[in-house]
């Protein structure tokens, strides 16, 4: 690594630590020529292959931005969005692959988003899964109702009734 001060082509690592979120390594280096110290941060590059075939670096900010649109008007905090972004990044990095498709990233978003807010989940899923009819929405809602734990499973004595949507007959 070149010294940023004197451009000497070598440096010595003085200290090495992982960052708080564990996604990168912070190294303290010292130049053998000018003896000045500097810090570098190393991360594994994670690339996303888009539908068009274009490859771009994974962006947690882009994930949060997309989810924020689905959460618009919902009681979801910025802190919750940041945690979701971190969970998604951890999930995609855990695959061990250096390249992912946008489909893989979308799948990684759906799980944490479903836990965060069901309405936002439906909004995101409608775009991600390309819903093009009311039947697609109804099928997703039926699937969510089937996954929802019953009142006994949650430990309360109450029963939760989720009414089916009323559909007007023409």
UniProtKB/Swiss-Prot annotation:
Zinc finger (unnamed): 3-34
Cofactor note (record): Binds 1 zinc ion.
Annotated InterPro entries: ATP-cone_dom, NrdR-like_N, RNR_NrdR-like
A GO MF term: DNA binding
Cofactor annotation: Zn(2+)
Domain annotation ATP-cone: ranges: 46-136
A Pfam short name: Zn_ribbon_NrdR
Domain of life of the organism encoding this protein: Bacteria
Swiss-Prot/TrEMBL GO biological process terms: negative regulation of DNA-templated transcription
Record key words, sorted: ATP-binding, DNA-binding, Metal-binding, Nucleotide-binding, Repressor, Transcription, Transcription regulation, Zinc, Zinc-finger
Disordered, as annotated region: 148-170
Function text: Negatively regulates transcription of bacterial ribonucleotide reductase nrd genes and operons by binding to NrdR-boxes.
Family: Belongs to the NrdR family.
Protein name: Transcriptional repressor NrdR
Native organism: Streptomyces griseus subsp. griseus (strain JCM 4626 / CBS 651.72 / NBRC 13350 / KCC S-0626 / ISP 5235)
Source lineage: Bacteria, Bacillati, Actinomycetota, Actinomycetes, Kitasatosporales
């Amino acid at each position: 690594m070149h010294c940023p001060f004197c451009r000497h082509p070598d440096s010595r690592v003085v200290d090495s630590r992982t960052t708080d979120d564990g996604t990168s390594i912070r190294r303290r280096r010292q130049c053998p020529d000018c003896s000045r110290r500097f810090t570098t941060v190393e991360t594994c590059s994670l690339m996303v292959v888009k539908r068009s075939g274009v490859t771009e670096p994974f962006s947690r900010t882009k994930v949060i931005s997309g989810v924020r649109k689905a959460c618009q008007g919902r009681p979801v905090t910025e802190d919750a969005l940041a945690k979701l972004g971190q969970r998604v990044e951890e999930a995609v990095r855990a695959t061990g692959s250096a390249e992912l498709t946008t489909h893989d990233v979308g799948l990684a978003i759906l799980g944490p988003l479903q836990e965060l807010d069901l309405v936002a989940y439906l909004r995101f899923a409608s775009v991600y899964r390309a819903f093009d009819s009311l039947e697609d929405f109804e099928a997703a809602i039926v699937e969510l109702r089937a996954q929802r734990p019953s009142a006994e499973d949650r430990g309360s004595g109450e029963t939760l009734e989720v009414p089916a949507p009323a559909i007007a007959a023409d």
